Amino acid sequence: MNLMEIVVICSLVLGILLLNRPVTMLAQRLYNRHQFRRFIVRETFYHSVVSRHLVYYNRLGLGEQRKFLFRTWLFQHSKNFRYIEVEQTAEMPILVSAVAVQLTFGLDKFKLNYFDDIFILRDDYHYGFYSRPFMGHVDQTGIYLSWDNFMKGISKQTPNCNVGLHEMAHALAYVNFVTETEEDRHFKKEFPNFSKVARPIFTAMQLDGVKNLLGDYAATNYHEFWAVAVEIFFESPVNFRHELPELYEAMSTVLNQDPLSFISGNTTIIRRLQPATGMASAGIGSAGMASSSITSAGITASIAPAPTSAAAAAH
């Protein structure tokens, strides 16, 4: 191979590398434009379903409601919904998708792209060798939700317990720190700061038996602390901020949204920070996990086929 051939090959490789991101972004814009035309036809139906069930959605302004519904459409159409011993209805995938969008509404990345499959079961179920029934769990094969418990959560029948938010919180951590398949730069940048506040609270709960509104189940391990904190953040923001103000602010920052701003009438996402220029330690340390190993760099990919989530009636 002569010098000219080497130069040509290097130029081609460099050109591919330089064009990859713009081409990918263009393809994504074209895809979203196509999907938006399809979504518009169904927007009224989506609004009717989501507005009946999600208080969060009803507190958004009109522009943000459309953004919310379109994200719900995109999320739904990126997944295979599988129904186990439960009769499928049109509202099921919409509501599950809407809860995922609620959690990620302040973030740029919201599809949880590692997970192709979402399994909806009728009610509590048994998983693996665990003796206690489960309301939901997340593992390599997908996101699992029991429909009965999911509906109780979004209808406020079980105070401070929302299995949809709980499992989506696990899934969000999974795609950012385990598979790293859909990393949100803001979320990964801010998670170490969240952990600086959260870790001492978790440690005090686990080692010293300190009680707070998060409940005993949050002390199981740091995965569950995170997921339970997400539930309380959306379900009881007033009480959360009153009892654990620093943790509330840290959660508001890492998710880039503040539910209390919606309640007070300010329906905009609280901030849009500059993208991170680097990736810091996620600040998650070993918590005696049965299903995963954890390092200071984040949740590492040694997940066994075991759930990362709450057993039924866990908190």
Q: Where are the regions a protein language model picked out?
A:
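N-terminal signal-anchor transmembrane alpha helix of single-pass membrane proteins
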Residues: 1-32
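A metal-dependent hydrolase signature that marks the N-terminal structural subdomain at the beginning
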Residues: 25-133, 247-261, 268-278
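Glycine-rich, often proline-containing surface loops adjacent to acidic residues and nearby aromatics
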Residues: 79, 139-148
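Hydrophobic (often cysteine-bearing) scaffold residues that line and stabilize catalytic clefts
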Residues: 92, 157-161, 223
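Metalloprotease/metallohydrolase-associated module, dominated by Zn2+-dependent proteases
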Residues: 96-105, 125-139, 153-155, 178-282, ...
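Short pre-active-site segment immediately N-terminal to the catalytic Zn-binding motif
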Residues: 147-163
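Active-site recognition of the HExxH zinc-binding catalytic motif
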Residues: 159-175, 227
